[in-house]
Amino acid sequence: MSTTFKLDTSTSRANPTPAPMKRLTVPKIRARKKDGKTEEPLVMLTAYTARQAQLLDAHCDLLLVGDSLGQVIYGLPSTIPVTLRMMADHAAAVVRGSYHSVVVVDMPFGSYEQSPQQAFESASFLLKESGAAAVKLEGGEAMAETVAFLNQRGIPVMGHVGLTPQAVNVLGGYAARGRNDAEADKIVTDAKALDDAGAFAIVIEGVLEPIAVAATEAVRAPTIGIGASAQCDGQVLVTEDMLGMFERVPRFVKKYGDIAETIEATAKTYAEEVRARSFPGPEQLYQPK
C-alpha cells in the first residue's frame, strides 16, 4: 500500500499557491531585522514530512524540523532519545516538500555538546543528508564557541535560549524561566553571546515576557518566540499543537483547529461504512466494459 508524493502547485484548498515561489535564504531572514526592529514578524512552524511541508510552506518564512518529532511522531517521552538519523531523514522529506521556506533542522541531544568539532561533524552530516539550509542548537554562552566554529565553516546556526527541552533533566521540568534575577540575566547574556557568535536567529522559549523583550532588544539577530512575547521578531509553534492534535498542550499554545476530532470522526465514518459494506461503492470500483 503506497501513496506517491508529488509536489502539487495547482490552486486548490489544500494547495493554495498557484506557482512556486523562490526559496528564502538565511541572509534574507537575518536581514529582516533592521535597526533593532522587524517590521513584519517571521513565521515559523515545525514540519516532519513532505506533505506537511507542502501544506505549510507558502505561509511560513521558516520550517523547523524539530527534535520534538521524538514525542510528536515517535511517541517518545522526551526529545532526549532522538538520533541524527531520524533528524536527517525527516529534514530531507521537508526539503523535498517545500520550495519557499528556509528549512532548519534541530541538532539532537548528544550530537554537538562535546566539542565544536563534534558539532561540525554532526551538522555537516545533517545538511549533506537532508539539503536543509541551517541547524538549530540549544544553549547560550556555553555554546557560543561552537556557534562561531560552525558559522566560520559555512554552517548557519539558529540559537535557542530560555527553556531548553534537551536540558529538562537539569532544569527539573518545563517551568518558565526568568523568575529570578539570576535566571533573567542569564537569558539575556546567553542571547547576546549567541548573537556575537554569529547566530542568524535565536529562539526564545518559555520565559517571562519582560525578559523576552529585553533579550530581543539586546541582540541584532531576529528572535523567534515560543511562550515568550509578541514583541519577539517572530513566532514558532509545534504544528500538531497548533492544529489541535493533542488534548493537553503547553499554556503558550493557541489551538487554531481541532484536527484530532476531525480525524477521529472521519475514521469512525470509514469504519462504519466498511462494516456496513457500503464502502467501497460503485464509484470506487472497476467494472468490466
Curated annotation (Swiss-Prot):
- Polar residues biased stretches: 1-15
Q: Which metal ions or organic cofactors does this protein require, according to UniProt?
A: Mg(2+)
Annotated catalytic residues: 205
Enzyme Commission number(s) of this protein: 2.1.2.11
A molecular function (GO) held by this record is: magnesium ion binding
Q: Where in the cell is it found?
A: Cytoplasm
Task: Tell me how this protein assembles.
Answer: Homodecamer; pentamer of dimers.
Q: What is this protein called?
A: 3-methyl-2-oxobutanoate hydroxymethyltransferase
Record the organism. Erythrobacter litoralis (strain HTCC2594)
Taxonomy of the source species: Bacteria, Pseudomonadati, Pseudomonadota, Alphaproteobacteria, Sphingomonadales
Q: Which gene encodes it?
A: panB
